[in-house]
């Protein structure tokens, strides 16, 4: 489970453990990942793996690490993702654009391509990629984020077609507005107008 240090991925991790699964919890943030394992109190059923999903080499090394700790890989639940600074395209720096695509697009591609052979070798496997409703309709100030999630959507749908007739199932999930730490994790602040600010004070 990627992004397991917070949000949807933390909830998925805890629920999977509650149901008796063994989970490899993946995140960039060591502190929040440790918080998840503390909440889990899973007595060895969860292993933690700290890495940057935008870096291909560590991702390619991940299956062997997970198998060494867990024995096998039967599923990938890819939740990790970030948003962009709330700004129009013309006002965005290329660094911000590239960072969103590095995590949301390349991270997804690296994980899916790396874990697919492991899953095809199992009796049954499942890939779940978390996209976003923002991949269907534009969200104000999130054009690049939406484009990255639209790419995740199409990749997942294409992989679903490619895996038809195999032992691997592929699913895309499209959350709407969910209370998570994505703004903090993305190092982004949400702009609020003066009236909203006054109402909050």
Regions found by a protein language model. Name each.
Residues 1-24:
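Canonical Rossmann dinucleotide-binding motif of NAD(H)/NADP(H)-dependent dehydrogenases/reductases
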Residues 19-35:
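Conserved glycine-rich Rossmann-like NAD(P)H-binding loop of the short-chain dehydrogenase/reductase
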Residues 31, 50-61, 94:
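The beta1-alpha1 cofactor-binding region of Rossmann-like NAD(H)/NADP(H)-dependent oxidoreductases
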Residues 87-89, 96-98:
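Substrate-binding pocket helix/loop in short-chain dehydrogenase/reductase
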Residues 112, 148:
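Active-site helix of classical SDR
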Residues 132:
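Residue(s) in the substrate-gating loop at a strand-loop-helix junction
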Residues 165-201:
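SDR active-site lid
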């Amino acid at each position: 489970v990627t992004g397991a240090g917070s949000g949807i991925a933390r909830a998925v991790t805890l629920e999977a453990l509650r149901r008796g699964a063994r989970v490899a919890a993946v995140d960039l943030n060591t502190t929040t990942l440790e918080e998840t394992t503390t909440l889990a109190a899973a007595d060895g059923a969860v292993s933690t793996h700290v890495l940057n999903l935008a870096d291909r080499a560590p991702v390619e090394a991940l299956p062997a690490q997970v198998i060494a700790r867990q024995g096998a890989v039967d599923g990938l639940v890819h939740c990790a993702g970030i948003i962009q600074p709330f700004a129009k395209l013309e006002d965005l720096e290329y660094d911000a654009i590239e960072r969103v695509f590095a995590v949301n697009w390349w991270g997804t591609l690296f994980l899916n391509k790396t874990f697919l052979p492991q899953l095809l070798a199992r009796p049954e496997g499942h890939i779940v990629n978390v996209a976003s409703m923002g991949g269907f309709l534009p969200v104000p100030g999130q054009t690049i984020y939406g484009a990255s999630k639209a790419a995740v959507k199409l990749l997942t749908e294409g992989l679903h077609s490619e895996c038809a007739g195999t032992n691997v199932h592929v699913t895309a999930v499209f959350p709407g507005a969910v209370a998570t730490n994505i703004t903090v994790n993305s190092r982004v602040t949400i702009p609020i107008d003066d009236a909203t600010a006054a109402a909050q004070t």
